[in-house]
Amino acid sequence: MAGNQGNYRENPTRNEKKYKKANGQPRLKEKSSRAKSDNVCPYAKKCGGCDYQGVEYKEQLKNKQAYMKKLLKPFCFVEPIVGMKNPLYYRHKVHAAFDCTRRGQIVAGAYRKNTHDVVDIESCMIEEQESDEIIRDIKDMLRSFRIKTYDEDTGYGLLRHVLVRKGYATGQIMVVLVLASPILPSKNNFVKALRKKHPNITTVVLNVNDKKTSMVLGDRNITLYGKGFIEDKLCGCTFRISPGSFYQVNPVQTELLYEKAIHEAHLTGKERVIDAYCGTGTIGIIAAKNAGEVIGVELNRDAIRDAVINAKRNDIRNIRFYNDDAGKFMVEMAQKGEKADVVIMDPPRTGSDEAFLSSVVKLSPERVVYVSCGPETLARDLKYLTKHGYTVKRATPYDCFPFTSHIETVCCLTFQGR
């Protein structure tokens, strides 16, 4: 989701709600015929984050395929959903909230659905296992280092959250300690003890969040060990991942998703491409190898900073980045008489707004490659674009989040004229 840069709310792993209705589109229906799975999570009833918990993976894919076919039937053919060979332990970004019970027990894990009550979770079947082990050991270390967990009601305490990010291809690990204060007692000894347990840790960052807010990360980062970031490889390119950077959590499926998006763009080396909602520049940088020129546009300043670094890191010289609203940027391009051959759009789950879509129509690129993480908003946006000169032949869904109801989709729209 390239639009959800930097900070985020609560625990995106286990506490996201099911899709809400958009333009009268139905919800993803409850599974009436459940083929039982051997992979049953002991925290399922308390956590509530995995809508397909206990359902055989083939049945999950069958349900998602049927849902997408019904939803996109007015617009295009839906190709078979691309599932995973191994749908377990795929999340390479793991977040745990910390709290202390009335009995004094330190707990770490997910928020109970629709609450801020922390469910103590030792390991999660969709999270990278070493990351879970690190969080578990941090929880055990708190008492010996006399570190108090933060209390949201009183504002007392220090440790609020722990975020662990691991590079799939590089194996590099970043641990982010989210504290209510910039001061961590015995910080050097704490980091030393943590690295003794987990020598693979590449960097440790202290993130300061001293506000009464449901946002996980604050604005200030203090590097305690290492460089303050990690790197990972995707589609032959290397990307820098900072504490607040957006980077897809399922690298296996993301590579397939992005390869499909680039394929649908039909690049020959001459095209001018706009990467809207470009985030840290992943899709644009990958596309630049086969395009004439790429322009990345993103509102989040920190994401643009990472995008520029990523382009330099990969020696990509035919890409430029702008810290601007993508819709406004494209309207101004059209007013100046400038053209683009391809627009690649990867909006947040809420989809695009009419202002952005109208800017696409004004610019009238030959092809629009839509990378969607929200099926209902994809259908809504396709309805607008197909009414304004675009056609779409097919869409390909990807199961990037097994055991949840979320679906990513790639489709290419072609301009036929007004």
Give a label for each model feature.
Residues 120-122, 126, 131, 135, ...:
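Accessory substrate-recognition/RNA-binding modules or partner subunits associated with SAM-dependent
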Residues 99, 164, 171-180, 238-242, ...:
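Short, aliphatic-rich beta-strand segments
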Residues 35-39, 45-149, 169, 184:
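Extended interfacial segments that mediate partner engagement and assembly in macromolecular machines
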Residues 2-31, 186-188, 192-418:
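Rossmann-like S-adenosyl-L-methionine
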Residues 109-112, 176-178, 307:
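Short, acidic/hydrophobic/Gly-rich beta-strand patch recurrent on exposed beta strands
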Residues 80-87, 152-153, 161, 165, ...:
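Short, solvent-exposed loop/turn elements at beta->coil junctions and helix N-caps
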Residues 92, 171-173, 270-271:
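Nucleotide donor/acceptor-binding cores
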Residues 149-156, 273:
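Short helix/loop segment immediately N-terminal to the Walker
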